[in-house]
Curated annotation (Swiss-Prot):
HAMAP family for the chain: Fumarate_red_D
Lineage, broadest ranks: Bacteria, Pseudomonadati, Pseudomonadota, Gammaproteobacteria, Vibrionales
Pfam families in UniProt: Fumarate_red_D
Annotated GO MF terms: succinate dehydrogenase activity
Subunit structure, interactors included: Part of an enzyme complex containing four subunits: a flavoprotein (FrdA), an iron-sulfur protein (FrdB), and two hydrophobic anchor proteins (FrdC and FrdD).
Protein name as it appears in the record: Fumarate reductase subunit D
Localisation per UniProt entry: Cell inner membrane
Keywords: Cell inner membrane, Cell membrane, Membrane, Transmembrane, Transmembrane helix
A GO cellular-component term linked to this record: fumarate reductase complex
Membrane-spanning ranges: 35-55, 67-87, 110-130
Function recorded in the entry: Anchors the catalytic components of the fumarate reductase complex to the cell membrane, binds quinones.
Length: 130
C-alpha cells in the first residue's frame, strides 16, 4: 500500500561523498567562542586596567609575563588568542566572498584557510622562540 502512495523509490547512497566542512566549522566555532568570551577580558585587563594602574605593574613585569608565556598554559593561551580568531575571521571571509558573488572556488578556500594556517604556525613558532 505504501508503494502505491509513493511513486518513486527512495534510493539511499551507502557511499556518500565526505565533506571537509566540519573541520572548518569546528575551527570557526572555536574561534568565535574564543573571540567572544576570552578576547574582551584580555583587552580589559591588558588594555584598560593595567594602563590605568588598577592592576599592579609588578604583576605584568617582563619576568612574570615571560614565565607565563613559556609555561604550557600560557603558550596555549597565546596560541589560542592568535590562531582561533584568525580561523573564525578567515571562515567568515571565505563565506562572505561567496555571499557577495565572488565565487573563488577552491582557490579562495586555499587562500583563506592557508592564511589562517600560516598565522597559526607563526604563533607556534614565535612561542618557541621565547
Amino acid at each position: 500500500m505504501f508503494l502505491l502512495w509513493c511513486k518513486e523509490l527512495i534510493v539511499i547512497n551507502t557511499n556518500p561523498k565526505r565533506s571537509d566542512e566540519p573541520v572548518w566549522w569546528s575551527l570557526f566555532g572555536a574561534g568565535g567562542t574564543w573571540f567572544a568570551m576570552i578576547t574582551p577580558i584580555t583587552v580589559l585587563v591588558l588594555g584598560i586596567l593595567a594602563p590605568l594602574g588598577v592592576i599592579d605593574a609588578e604583576a605584568l613585569s617582563y619576568e612574570r609575563v615571560s614565565s607565563f608565556a613559556t609555561s604550557i598554559i600560557g603558550a596555549l593561551f597565546i596560541i589560542g588568542t592568535l590562531a582561533l580568531p584568525m580561523w573564525h575571521a578567515m571562515h567568515r571571509v571565505h563565506h562572505g566572498m561567496h555571499d557577495l558573488k565572488f565565487h573563488t572556488g577552491v582557490a579562495g578556500k586555499i587562500a583563506c584557510y592557508g592564511f589562517a594556517t600560516i598565522i597559526s604556525a607563526l604563533a607556534v613558532v614565535f612561542i618557541f622562540m621565547i
